[in-house]
């Protein structure tokens, strides 16, 4: 009889020691996985938590409640999350989520899990199936005073939640209206890790969804229209393409004026083309790969597909904010188009929706946009995208080391002419009245491939919108230029340089 009580005293001492430091040490959690067969893991047991020395470790539980029937989803270890700090019991407070989630600190604290609605409804406690009595069970029934302290902690946490919505985990709640097709992300805990970018409508977080990294774009409530527009574009039939950003889910977090709107997409560690070009000089083949996949993505976005892979009609879509910051790069430098908050669909027999003229990023605005002289037809909007593509292609060439000459530090289009923060009036003067474009360096024209690519760039940013190339034509040209240059030997490079037209490029005639 002495040994169990000695062990009990030792465990109580360790709990008190953790409490004295302001945290309960978590080293082991109850483990359970409802999808153990599919994921090829154990169904249940104990899980030993591992993490960085300066990070706190927690346990978590997630479950569903279908008409009073409790269906356990997962239990296990949860890494450092301020929402779990000093919580000795696993308590979920959401009103009616798809999946309940709770986390706590302390060994095996997720054995029991509780739902305590914020609205003050009745507390509902869910217990696992009866098992053989354990030391932890004896401890749970012995330390009743801890329950009172836990209720005080829960009250403080409830007040904190009402002050600011937490970022520790996510359960998906769709805004009223038809939800976009997406997997049940709410079945899997999602944890925000770090801010990767800040933009016009909010910030982008790197987050962890089980074993995968994802990107979470968070919009404030006042930018609901942009969030809703981008969600609708992602939900358009046929938007699954290797050169378009992969959509995972959309979510509304929080309540009333403190609500936030989330878009969850694939995460690409190399970031945007802008960021990559700032820190890297690229080779000829890398330039061609980025340019070809980027133009392929825009070509597909612009395309009208009557019946796309059985999903239905994919309408033509104009991006309207095409720039290097909105082109992401996969690990192999394959380009992926992102940020469809200003995009507009062109469906037969329907108005295109919000088509205000001067939208997008000033630096990348076509002359007709800067002038406010837009023809509000589909082709006009697609040609505006093509002007911006010409500028992005110029950015690629400016950081390519293929030519025999210096590679300058990365600069945005027109940064050399009018600086980093040009006004609308300055751009109108330079782009519209003086018809200037970013400078094409002389030594670029001495490389056969870059020389041909510069011709394509000039035909993309042509002042006459109707003379601009289509994205599909750019894709064909880049592919042809790459093959022609890579197929030549050093002995015949000179002859190619003397006449750019040695390679028959696809016709300039626009197919938009």
Curated annotation (Swiss-Prot):
Q: Which Pfam families match?
A: Activin_recp, Pkinase
- Which residues are listed as membrane-spanning? 138-158
Q: What is catalysed by this protein? A: L-threonyl-[receptor-protein] + ATP = O-phospho-L-threonyl-[receptor-protein] + ADP + H(+); L-seryl-[receptor-protein] + ATP = O-phospho-L-seryl-[receptor-protein] + ADP + H(+)
Q: What is its EC number?
A: 2.7.11.30
Location (main, coarse): membrane
Entry's PROSITE patterns?
Answer: PROTEIN_KINASE_DOM, PROTEIN_KINASE_ST
Membrane topology of the entry: Single-pass type I membrane protein
Keywords annotated in UniProt: ATP-binding, Cell membrane, Disulfide bond, Glycoprotein, Kinase, Magnesium, Manganese, Membrane, Metal-binding, Nucleotide-binding, Phosphoprotein, Receptor, Serine/threonine-protein kinase, Signal, Transferase, Transmembrane, Transmembrane helix
Its cellular-component GO annotations read: activin receptor complex; plasma membrane
Q: Name one GO molecular function term.
A: metal ion binding
Q: Which cofactor does it need?
A: Mg(2+); Mn(2+)
Q: Which GO terms describe its biological process?
A: activin receptor signaling pathway; cellular response to growth factor stimulus; pattern specification process
Per the record, ranges on the Extracellular side are: 19-137
Q: Where is the Protein kinase domain?
A: 190-480
Location in or out of the cell: Cell membrane
Sequence segments annotated as region (Interaction with DYNLT1): 491-512
Is Transmembrane helix given among the entry's keywords?
yes
Residues carrying sugar: 42, 65
Residues annotated as the enzyme's active site? 321 (proton acceptor)
PTM summary: Phosphorylated. Constitutive phosphorylation is in part catalyzed by its own kinase activity.
Q: Where is ATP bound in this sequence?
A: 196-204, 217
Residues making up the signal peptide according to the UniProt record: 1-18
Return the broad EC class.
transferase
Q: Which family does it belong to?
A: Belongs to the protein kinase superfamily. TKL Ser/Thr protein kinase family. TGFB receptor subfamily.
As for what it does, the entry says: Transmembrane serine/threonine kinase activin type-2 receptor forming an activin receptor complex with activin type-1 serine/threonine kinase receptors (ACVR1, ACVR1B or ACVR1c). Transduces the activin signal from the cell surface to the cytoplasm and is thus regulating many physiological and pathological processes including neuronal differentiation and neuronal survival, hair follicle development and cycling, FSH production by the pituitary gland, wound healing, extracellular matrix production, immunosuppression and carcinogenesis.
UniProt-recorded name of the protein: Activin receptor type-2B
Taxonomy-wise, where does this protein's organism fall, top ranks first? Eukaryota, Metazoa, Chordata, Craniata, Vertebrata
